[in-house]
Each structure stands twice: as structure tokens, then as C-alpha cells.
Amino acid sequence: MRKYINYLLVLFLVSSCTSDTEAEPQALETSTTTSSTTTSSTTTTVQKIDEDIVVDEFGIELLEVSPEMKQQFDELIAFVEKRTGLTYSEYPKFNLYTLEGYRDYSAASYLDDFEKEYEEGEWERAVLSENMWGLPNASPEKMKELIVEFQRCASAGSYNLLDQILRVPIKRNQTKLNLWEQSVIVHELVHSLQGQIIDLSEWYTTMKDSDDFMNYPGRRSIMEAQADLVQAYWESNLDSYDRQRMASERPNFRCSVSLPEYFYIPFDLYYDFGARLGKQIHSNGRMEALNEALYK
């Protein structure tokens, strides 16, 4: 199962399995003006099937970015730069999917990595060994099915530190991003910026090659805390009507998959402990302290 945990290290997720979190205005600075899988060997390829349909490396449809969406991205990028005090070195890469397409990508990406990482019989031996220790009680095939389904429903958006692409599901046939989609994109844009300030791909590859991930949890926790904080800043600019509208725009996520408890330890670490650690750092030195903790 360790290889699956390593796969999760590559993905920076906005969880869809947890309850909605409200922004905390009391923890925000007063000036909130806005200017507007481990897949280590996967090559990201965008293919054009015909004049109207573009697909990703797994043949899953990518939605077209309208001029209005591009302007919204520009505004959200400017907001992230303003709130973090940092600047993108290049325009962030992103893929937009339908919700079902995003879920298909999440499953396909995991299965692609699964085929590359596990030798014949290795997965079966790993699961049966854990069965002997009283951990999962499912068969190897059932456990694989559960993990694939978990990958499909576990996130509302993601950033992959290896190919440096943020991926977000949006509604089809709309010219502008709704508030829910913008909020998710803000979170992932922070990770995209972090990936440009730090060479996260090289950082991860070095850890994987040396089989030493000791430095990962601390930095990842702070990275999630910073992304959550900037997302909360953005949501704090919404009035009560817009907050209600954003809540109504959230897709009807269903994630009833139940995995062994230890599968959730990384999520608790990054999204619970990380948030508390980030708030402590931020309360002592504001965003500059978070940047220093991450980048120095």
C-alpha cells in the first residue's frame, strides 16, 4: 500500500468528501482587494480528435476555455499573486473537464500509474499480507476497485506536481466560471504558484529515488494551509447572497467509499494538522512567514 500513499504525494487535492468550510474573516488581513497520480513517467499529451473536441492523454474530453473564462483566470491569478506577495514565472497550465470527465481522468491516471508501479503479483501479495495483520479484509481485486472509486470521488480539483497541470471540473456550455469553480481554481492556482517557486517535480523525484519522504509531510502541510488561506481570502469578498449561490453551485458529490482507516492518515495530516500549523505561522508573521517556511 505504500506505493498508493506515494501516489497521493503527487496530487494536491481540494477534497469533495469533507463538509464545506466557511472562510474565517477574523483570521484575515484587513486589505482584501482583488484586482479583478503517482504518474512519474506519464507524458501529458493533448490530442485534437476533430475540429470541436480536444482530449487529454487518456482520450478524455477537455472543455474549451472561453474568452470570458480566460479573463477570469487572469483575475484569479492576479488575486493569488497579490495575496501571497509572489509572482508566477509563467502562465499556469490547466485542463478543464466535465465532472464525469474529471472523475474518469482521476481513475485513469491512477490505473496508469498502477500498471507501471506494480510488478505481476506484487499487489496481491501486499493486500494479502495486510489481511494477515488485520488491516483490510477485502480481496486484492476488491481493494483495487475501492481505491479506483475513491480516486473518482475524492476531490473537486487537483494539481499534479510532476506535470504541473491543475485540473478542475466545470459545467459544460457555460461562458463564465461560476463561484464554486473559481474558489476551487484559486486553491489550485496557489499550488501551481508554489510549484513554480519550488521545483516540486525535482523535489519529489529526489525523494522517490532515495526512498526518503521525511521532508514531505511538513512542507506539504504548509502548502495546503497557504492554499486554504488564500482561498478563504477570496471567499471573504463574497456577500451573503454570493455565498448562498456558491453553495448551490457545488456539484452533488457522492463519495461513500470506505477504505481502511490508515488510508486517511495523509489527508488528516495535510488538511487538519496543516491548517492548524499554517494558522499558527500566519498569526505570528502573516503571509511573509508562510512564504519563508515554504521557500527558505
Question: Where is each model-derived feature located?
Answer:
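Short pre-active-site segment immediately N-terminal to the catalytic Zn-binding motif
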Residues: 153, 166-186, 218
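Extracellular mucin-like PTS domains
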Residues: 27-46
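Bacterial signal peptide processing site
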Residues: 18-20
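Catalytic zinc-binding patch centered on the HExxH motif and its immediate surroundings
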Residues: 102-124, 141-166
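C-terminal motif of bacterial Sec signal peptides marking the signal peptidase cleavage site
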Residues: 13-16
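Catalytic glutamate of the conserved HExxH
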Residues: 184, 188-196
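Pan-zinc metallopeptidase signature
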Residues: 258-296
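Post-HExxH zinc-binding segment in Zn-dependent metallohydrolases
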Residues: 76, 196-249
